[in-house]
C-alpha cells in the first residue's frame, strides 16, 4: 500500500483524507506521526501555502506528501479573509472571534456573495519540480447571523443557496459530498 504524509494535525481533516484515500489503496499518515511541525504559511495564495506545507512534510519524512490550504473569500471585501481565514481575528483557530469580525465588517453590506476555496498540493519529494495541484470551490452567501451546530470555522454563516441552509445545518456526510475540499480531493485523486 502506498503511503502519503498529510501535512495536518487536524483530526477532522485526517479522518476525511484517510477515508477518501483508502478507496485508492493509499494510506494517509498524519505529520504528527513523525513529529513534523507546521510549516510557516508565508505564501500569498492558498496554493503557495499548500506547496510550502507539502514540501515541509516531504523534507522531514522522506515520503511523498499532500497538503491543503483552505479559506473563505468574501467578494465585497476583496477576498477577505482569504489566506488569513483561520487567524482573521488575530488569534489562530478562534472560530467565534473570526465569525464576529467578519459579520461586523459586513454590517450594512448587501453583497454577501462568497466562496470557500481549497488548494491541494502533492509532492513526491521535497524538491519535486512539478507538484500535482488541484482546486475546489464552493459558492454561497454569508448569513446575517449564526445558524446550525455542525461543522467548524465559518460553516455556521455560510449559506448554500440551493438548500437555503448553512453548512452547519447539514450533516457531515452531506457536507463531505459537496464541500470545496471534497471537490479538490476528487480532482487530485484522478491525477495520482
From Swiss-Prot:
<feature type="binding site">
    <location>
        <begin position="8"/>
        <end position="13"/>
    </location>
    <ligand>
        <name>substrate</name>
    </ligand>
</feature>
<comment type="function">
    <text>Pyrophosphatase that catalyzes the hydrolysis of nucleoside triphosphates to their monophosphate derivatives, with a high preference for the non-canonical purine nucleotides XTP (xanthosine triphosphate), dITP (deoxyinosine triphosphate) and ITP. Seems to function as a house-cleaning enzyme that removes non-canonical purine nucleotides from the nucleotide pool, thus preventing their incorporation into DNA/RNA and avoiding chromosomal lesions.</text>
</comment>
<dbReference type="GO" id="GO:0036220">
    <property type="term" value="F:ITP diphosphatase activity"/>
</dbReference>
<keyword id="KW-0460">Magnesium</keyword>
<feature type="binding site">
    <location>
        <position position="40"/>
    </location>
    <ligand>
        <name>Mg(2+)</name>
    </ligand>
</feature>
<dbReference type="GO" id="GO:0036222">
    <property type="term" value="F:XTP diphosphatase activity"/>
</dbReference>
<keyword id="KW-0479">Metal-binding</keyword>
<dbReference type="GO" id="GO:0035870">
    <property type="term" value="F:dITP diphosphatase activity"/>
</dbReference>
<feature type="binding site">
    <location>
        <position position="69"/>
    </location>
    <ligand>
        <name>Mg(2+)</name>
    </ligand>
</feature>
<feature type="binding site">
    <location>
        <position position="70"/>
    </location>
    <ligand>
        <name>substrate</name>
    </ligand>
</feature>
<dbReference type="GO" id="GO:0000166">
    <property type="term" value="F:nucleotide binding"/>
</dbReference>
<comment type="similarity">
    <text>Belongs to the HAM1 NTPase family.</text>
</comment>
<protein>
    <recommendedName>
        <fullName>dITP/XTP pyrophosphatase</fullName>
        <ecNumber>3.6.1.66</ecNumber>
    </recommendedName>
</protein>
<dbReference type="Pfam" id="PF01725">
    <property type="entry name" value="Ham1p_like"/>
</dbReference>
<keyword id="KW-0546">Nucleotide metabolism</keyword>
<dbReference type="GO" id="GO:0046872">
    <property type="term" value="F:metal ion binding"/>
</dbReference>
<feature type="binding site">
    <location>
        <begin position="152"/>
        <end position="155"/>
    </location>
    <ligand>
        <name>substrate</name>
    </ligand>
</feature>
<dbReference type="GO" id="GO:0009146">
    <property type="term" value="P:purine nucleoside triphosphate catabolic process"/>
</dbReference>
<feature type="binding site">
    <location>
        <begin position="180"/>
        <end position="181"/>
    </location>
    <ligand>
        <name>substrate</name>
    </ligand>
</feature>
<dbReference type="GO" id="GO:0017111">
    <property type="term" value="F:ribonucleoside triphosphate phosphatase activity"/>
</dbReference>
<feature type="binding site">
    <location>
        <position position="175"/>
    </location>
    <ligand>
        <name>substrate</name>
    </ligand>
</feature>
<feature type="active site" description="Proton acceptor">
    <location>
        <position position="69"/>
    </location>
</feature>
<dbReference type="InterPro" id="IPR029001">
    <property type="entry name" value="ITPase-like_fam"/>
</dbReference>
<dbReference type="GO" id="GO:0009117">
    <property type="term" value="P:nucleotide metabolic process"/>
</dbReference>
<dbReference type="InterPro" id="IPR020922">
    <property type="entry name" value="dITP/XTP_pyrophosphatase"/>
</dbReference>
<comment type="subunit">
    <text>Homodimer.</text>
</comment>
<keyword id="KW-0547">Nucleotide-binding</keyword>
<dbReference type="GO" id="GO:0005829">
    <property type="term" value="C:cytosol"/>
</dbReference>
<keyword id="KW-0378">Hydrolase</keyword>
<dbReference type="InterPro" id="IPR002637">
    <property type="entry name" value="RdgB/HAM1"/>
</dbReference>
